[in-house]
């Protein structure tokens, strides 16, 4: 009684949360549900004929017409408070205690999906045929692994639980069991057990000798993995907002993989790097820029055998091997030459040119074209900037040389000026000396002319007169006679 009250409360709660839009969608997909009913019968199916009184809620739904359909709300079918325990977890030595089963019946003959909004009718079964079920088949399908509705089969205490030999329903005494249901056009509720092989609709009414499989066969069927779901069935489930557990895990794993790749790929995570790192001169030496063949790890294809001679000068000793080919080079043979050996993976100029040539032939589309054009534009601008900086450095060196030459010329001019000043001073001194000498010569010449005039005017000879001491003028004239002749 407690389980019955719980099922009724659950039906009321589900009826309260019905949505008109979902009803309309389910009504639109009703033909597809009927078409897929044959393909959804996986495994052994058992048909349950309509027995017992009809359910009142189903009668109300049938009276409303085909436009009003119950809503499939799989999230609230089984509350967390209800225990779900497989019957095979029971200890093997414990005698099985069978209880009264519950049969779901429907009045509407048209193919439809039973939902949790339909109430469950408890149909007592006779206890005289206890041999029909030796052990309950406890197959509980997960909520998210089937594309059909589920029926809640409740149990109540009883001594045994059997149905007619031609129709059997898997029942367990541990609690609530969930089975996917399909309703065929002949007023039968088909309880589907997931299995690998797909059986046609004609297998819904098997012969009596083959309807009671053994415990070993049932255990074997339970242990077999489920087959791949039908794509149309999965599409229908996605339209209703239902996904299987495997599909959900696959979606989450793909999402995590995309996130991991987008964050771990250095070719796309370095878009916000500095301009220096995006230059062609910097990313050419980056091994990630090379092709997949050039960047291939040597451990996958074996160790690379490098040449014993330099590829440029054809001589050996102290070679730098290339990380992507068999070539080796001297550090001094490279253009430009290297002073210290590079650390890590080093790529020779030949492989760099090959990678650049191959990269230029790849067409760029979309965002890659924008990024490529931006990088190309920045590269051209950087090259122009480098040229201007180089020209500026050359002009600056020329300016320094001219300044040095100017300083040298200034010092030379200063020395010339000093020499000129000294020469002018010496010239002035010499000129003054010459002026004095000329004055002296004029005096001497005047004195001589005076003596000649006196000699011509006086008839008496000089010896006749008294002897006098010669004057200083005469003495100086005789002294300066030799310098005057020299000049």
From Swiss-Prot:
Single GO term (MF): zinc ion binding
Ranges of compositional bias, category Basic and acidic residues: 220-229
Region Disordered, annotated ranges: 196-229
Domain of life assignment: Eukaryota
Zinc fingers classed as PHD-type: ranges: 307-354
SMART domains: PHD
Gene3D superfamilies per record: Zinc/RING finger domain, C3HC4 (zinc finger)
Coiled-coil spans in chain: 380-420
Pfam family, one: PHD
Keywords, sorted A to Z: Coiled coil, Metal-binding, Zinc, Zinc-finger
PANTHER family referenced in this protein's UniProt entry, alphabetically: PHD FINGER PROTEIN, PHD FINGER PROTEIN 21B
Protein name: PHD finger protein 21B
Species whose genome carries this gene: Mus musculus (Mouse)
């Amino acid at each position: 009684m407690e389980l019955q009250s719980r099922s009724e409360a659950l039906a009321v709660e589900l009826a309260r949360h019905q949505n008109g839009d979902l009803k309309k969608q389910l009504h639109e997909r009703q033909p597809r549900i009927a078409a897929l009913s044959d393909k959804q019968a996986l495994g052994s199916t058992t048909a349950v004929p309509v027995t017992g009184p009809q359910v009142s809620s189903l009668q109300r739904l049938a009276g409303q017409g085909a436009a009003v359909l119950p809503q499939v709300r799989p999230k609230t079918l089984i509350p967390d408070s209800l225990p779900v325990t497989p019957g095979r977890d029971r200890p093997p030595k414990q005698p099985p205690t069978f209880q009264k089963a519950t049969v779901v019946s429907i009045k509407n003959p048209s193919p439809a999906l039973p939902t949790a909004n339909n109430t469950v009718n408890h149909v007592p079964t006779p206890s005289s045929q206890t041999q029909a079920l030796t052990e309950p088949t406890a197959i509980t399908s997960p909520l998210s692994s089937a594309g059909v509705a589920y029926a809640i089969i409740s149990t109540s205490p009883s001594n045994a639980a059997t149905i007619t030999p031609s129709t059997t329903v898997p029942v367990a005494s541990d609690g609530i069991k969930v089975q996917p249901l399909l309703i065929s056009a002949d007023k039968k509720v088909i309880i589907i057990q997931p299995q690998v092989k797909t059986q046609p609709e004609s297998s819904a009414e098997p012969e009596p000798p083959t309807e009671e499989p053994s415990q070993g066969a049932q255990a074997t069927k339970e242990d077999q993995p489920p087959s791949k779901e039908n794509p149309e069935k999965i599409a229908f489930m996605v339209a209703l907002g239902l996904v299987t557990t495997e599909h959900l895990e696959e979606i989450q794993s793909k999402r995590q993989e995309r996130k991991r790749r987008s964050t771990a790929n250095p070719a796309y995570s370095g878009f916000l790097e500095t301009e220096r790192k995006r230059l062609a001169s910097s990313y050419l030496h980056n091994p990630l820029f090379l092709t997949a063949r050039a960047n291939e790890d040597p451990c996958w294809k074996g160790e690379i055998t490098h040449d014993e001679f330099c590829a440029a000068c054809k001589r050996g000793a102290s070679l730098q091997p290339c990380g992507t080919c068999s070539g080796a080079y001297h550090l001094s043979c490279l253009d430009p030459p290297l002073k210290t050996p590079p650390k890590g993976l080093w790529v020779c100029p030949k492989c760099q040119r090959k990678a650049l040539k191959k990269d230029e032939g790849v067409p760029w589309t979309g965002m890659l074209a924008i990024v490529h054009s931006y990088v190309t534009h920045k590269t051209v601008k950087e090259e122009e900037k480098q040229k201007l900086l180089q020209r500026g450095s050359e002009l600056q060196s020329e300016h320094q040389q001219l300044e040095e030459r100017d300083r040298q010329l200034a010092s030379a001019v200063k020395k010339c000026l000093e020499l000129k000043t000294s020469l002018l001073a010496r010239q002035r001194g010499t000129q003054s000396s010459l002026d004095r000498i000329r004055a002296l010569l004029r005096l001497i010449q005047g004195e001589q002319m005076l003596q000649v005039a006196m000699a011509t005017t006086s008839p008496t000879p000089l010896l006749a007169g008294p002897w006098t001491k010669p004057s200083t003028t005469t003495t100086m004239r005789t002294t300066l006679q030799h310098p005057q002749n020299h000049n």
